[in-house]
Amino acid sequence: MELVVEPLNLHLNAETGSTLLDVLRSNEVPISYSCMSGRCGTCRCRVIAGHLRDNGPETGRPQAGKGTYVLACQAVLTEDCTIEIPESDEIVVHPARIVKGTVTAIDEATHDIRRLRIKLAKPLEFSPGQYATVQFTPECVRPYSMAGLPSDAEMEFQIRAVPGGHVSNYVFNELSVGASVRISGPLGTAYLRRTHTGPMLCVGGGTGLAPVLSIVRGALESGMSNPIHLYFGVRSEQDIYDEERLHALAARFPNLKVNVVVATGPAGPGRRSGLVTDLIGRDLPNLAGWRAYLCGAPAMVEALNLLVARLGIVPGHIHADAFYPSGV
């Protein structure tokens, strides 16, 4: 059977029953991958023509834009087909690893957010904006976004208290400095695209600030000169944290513009009142040529996704990380 890979216009012979990722890798086609088990979403690609047997989590998921999306590691070739892979400048390959670490600090960022710092026994490579699974005990395991960069001396996570949440309750009430943890990753596709030269819109709601911090620092500290508009949205003044950190970055890098947005109640000096979606719509009415990184609560991310698409960002340049609750 024949597999056509766009935009490379590459025609490959493949055996029925092979996974798409195996065929791409064996033919040295550049594609991002990590976990190889359908968890991380890194090897996502689009089916243009034909069909594949999809065993992964993309099955039944609403699709943005035209075509059907599959995870290459979970899609099995059954007939001639044509797929589209991400642009080669977006390819990242960070083999998933499990690394031991030690909690070195637990700080109170806000009334319901704790900042964890973890010293890893070995380095863990990841792209800014990705996340990892953190195991505190065999029963307490959850995914959290990295707030820093691989070059940082310690790994940082920002964890919000979830009412009735088993893991967040453990972090807030039982976890102590010196505890051993296991970090598994990296995971996720909402990572920084380094070769993009146009403007960037980075929006973090609540602890969605963690991956946004990673993305923005990754861009700035690697020398990217793109105009970056960062919006940090919170419910009220008491939910604001890392404000000085954001403004310190903006002072160092003139291409970064920071907006701290408070939805309800007084905003305070230097901040803005209202909904992030409303302010972006007024501030940036034409987003053609931009890339967007959207992180936070699902309702906010979904609303932003619709907004930025309407304002001109093509679906492939919208990178979203919605923080769905994991239950108790």
From Swiss-Prot:
Q: In which pathway does it act?
A: Aromatic compound metabolism; naphthalene degradation
One of the record's GO molecular function terms: ferredoxin-NAD+ reductase activity
What Gene Ontology cellular component terms go with this record? catalytic complex
Q: Which GO terms describe its biological process?
A: electron transport chain; naphthalene catabolic process; salicylic acid catabolic process
Task: Name the SUPFAM superfamilies for this protein.
Answer: 2Fe-2S ferredoxin-like, Ferredoxin reductase-like, C-terminal NADP-linked domain, Riboflavin synthase domain-like
Q: Name the cofactor(s).
A: [2Fe-2S] cluster; FAD
Pinpoint the 2Fe-2S ferredoxin-type domain residues: 1-89
The signal sequence is: none
Query: Is NAD there in the keyword field?
Result: yes
Q: What is its EC number?
A: 1.18.1.7
Keywords from UniProt, A to Z, are: 2Fe-2S, Aromatic hydrocarbons catabolism, FAD, Flavoprotein, Iron, Iron-sulfur, Metal-binding, NAD, NADP, Oxidoreductase, Plasmid
Which residues are [2Fe-2S] cluster-binding?
A: C35, C40, C43, C73
- State how the cofactor is bound: Binds 1 [2Fe-2S] cluster.
The keyword Glycosyltransferase is assigned to this record: no
Q: Which domain of life is it from?
A: Bacteria
Q: PANTHER family, alphabetically?
A: NADH OXIDOREDUCTASE HCR, PROTEIN RFBI
What protein am I looking at? Naphthalene 1,2-dioxygenase/salicylate 5-hydroxylase systems, ferredoxin--NAD(P)(+), reductase component
- Source organism: Ralstonia sp
Q: What lineage is on file? A: Bacteria, Pseudomonadati, Pseudomonadota, Betaproteobacteria, Burkholderiales
